[in-house]
Amino acid sequence: MLDQNVITETKAEHLLHEYQPGAFFLASPHRVLLAKGICEIVPEADGQNQMETLSGRIAEALRQAKQSGQSRPLVVGAVPFDQVKAARLVVPEEVRWSGPLQFDHEEKEQQAGHTYHIKPVPEPEDYKNGVEQGLARIADGTLSKIVLSRSLHLTSPEPIQTDELLRHLAQHNSHGYTFAADVSSQEETSPRRTLLGASPELLVSRMGTQVVSNPLAGSRPRSNDPVEDQRRAAELLSSAKDLHEHAVVADAVAAALRPFCRTLEVPEKPSLIKTETMWHLSSVIKGELSDPSVTALELAAALHPTPAVCGTPTDLAREAILSIEPFDRGFFTGMVGWCDDAGDGEWIVTIRCAEAEERSLRLYAGAGVVAGSKPEDELQETSAKFRTMLRAMGVDHI
């Protein structure tokens, strides 16, 4: 179990500023984790489905770390969207904790330090055509929901400073989950690749027997006009389409958690949460484990991927995504987090994120498509979601 005594006197801001590429960083509303070095690497599985044996491979890595002298080992890293792709998980050599980030000043709007060449993949019109394909599969009854995403490929003449980018993300998103994880290929000649972002969505947290999940579905872009901003929030909360989209996700999360829980509290209706750029419909689902040996990773594996990032039915939606989207999602819409040898852990949905490699960045954003969705609206929603990363980079618009 995570011992609250390991929450040190170190200020969270110090851990943020100590982060360097190659380390693991996760700031949640409750704590900050900085992990460095590699004691053990969780190996890839031999079979096609990497998730099937992931819990066992993590348990073995933790056991090896204990034999090496670690008293309270934990695993950190990221799991991709596609279950046939390998996760990037390690037992770090050094782990430091603190309380949550609490900035005593508001950061000024970030100015762009680089000039970027930006290429959308797919092009906006092609993305809208993809939404039409998704709507056709909904209309013929194949799917009830599909989440379709697009990407921005940014290149710069200068190396990407991921440590600076992480600090900007954290200062603008202190109420969510800011993360950075090394997802480099294990081949020695490969360049370093870093997954970083600021997600508002908790896939699952397990502390002792207490379980929490916070699915989000249904959203609106924020407005700089306070009156218009509140109008959009109220409209979202009363939108039949968005309430239906949210109910599909919340019901699926509850159904996945129920077999593990002695009790489960599911809100009758969603509430609103906000980030700097978006309004979201949110349901905080809380439960108590019936079997205390079930780990945070096992719960996360049962939930991943939720309809919030994939669709329903899950397998058919995943197949449609692979057919419609012209790129590999990588770790986008996967999960990032940690799990210790007692089973405690936090796993975050990897949205509002990018993968950085040398002088390039790949940003990702998706939108849920259900009956009644309009392609232009979904395009605008993805544009709004890109703003989390773009603002941290000092890019006003694309």
Swiss-Prot record:
Pfam families: Chorismate_bind (PF00425). It is an enzyme of class 5 (isomerase). Keywords: Isomerase, Phosphoprotein. It catalyses: chorismate = isochorismate. Its EC number is 5.4.4.2. Pathway: Siderophore biosynthesis; bacillibactin biosynthesis. Coiled coil: none annotated. It comes from the Bacteria. InterPro entries: ADC_synthase (IPR005801), Chorismate_C (IPR015890), IsoChor_synthase (IPR004561). One of its GO terms (molecular function) is isochorismate synthase activity. The keyword NADP does not apply. The modification Phosphoserine is found at S271. The keyword Plastid does not apply. One of its GO terms (biological process) is biosynthetic process. Belongs to the isochorismate synthase family. This is Isochorismate synthase DhbC. The lineage of its organism: Bacteria, Bacillati, Bacillota, Bacilli, Bacillales.
